[in-house]
Amino acid sequence: MSANNGWEPRTRLGKQVVEGEIDSMQEALNSGLPLKESEVVDQLVPDLEDEVLDINMVQRMTDSGRRVKFRCVVAVGNRDGLIGYAEGRDDQVGGAIQKAIDIAKLNIIDVSRGCGSWECGCGRPHTVALRTEGKAGSVEVELQPAPRGLGLAGGETVRKVLELAGIEDIWTRSSGNTRTTVNFAKATFNALQNTAEARVPERTFEKREVIE
């Protein structure tokens, strides 16, 4: 695999990707090497999609007067098990979105999917493999395996994140201020991240910290 658009990797993981030693995102995540270059994801997941979940204008008073920045909440995924989440801030909306996308790529995880519902038995990876919970601020989200054909039983924000992750069927339960999109999306991502933690060896996951 050759470098894309003149990318010259600076990390060991990036070099292994360019040299063809690592040729899948799952292999990269299981390598134990920290993911610090978004270009790694660009190379290994060319079909990655992004979804802007929320855009907010944030005002702050400084010595020079009122400063305005935009905060964007973004999720990225390939609809086949890979999902990332991040927030980005910038003076311009476009800049905030791009920052969030780049950071979300560095936060990408491989969700543990399966046919985890006792009501089903198809053996396809259409739902989460196990019950999981996630929390962000006052919001708590619980995801439970569901039988094939149920669909995504949850709010719009939850559905957008789960669709990008490749989850087709799910039972959800949420509490707290779920109208706050940023916390609702982050709690959902944290729940999915817990499924990844449950199956990845500790020595590998200890370096996978979510970037703020």
UniProtKB/Swiss-Prot annotation:
Record-level GO BP terms: translation
Domain S5 DRBM: from-to ranges: 48-111
Quaternary assembly: Part of the 30S ribosomal subunit. Contacts protein S4.
Covalent S-S links between cysteines: none
Organism the protein comes from: Haloarcula marismortui (strain ATCC 43049 / DSM 3752 / JCM 8966 / VKM B-1809)
Cross-referenced InterPro entries: Ribosomal_Su5_D2-typ_SF, Ribosomal_uS5, Ribosomal_uS5_arc, Ribosomal_uS5_C, Ribosomal_uS5_euk/arc, Ribosomal_uS5_N, Ribosomal_uS5_N_CS, Ribsml_uS5_D2-typ_fold_subgr
Protein's recorded name: Small ribosomal subunit protein uS5
Functional summary from the UniProt entry: With S4 and S12 plays an important role in translational accuracy.
Family annotation (Gene3D superfamilies): 3.30.160.20, 3.30.230.10
Gene Ontology cellular-component annotations: small ribosomal subunit
Lineage of origin: Archaea, Methanobacteriati, Methanobacteriota, Stenosarchaea group, Halobacteria
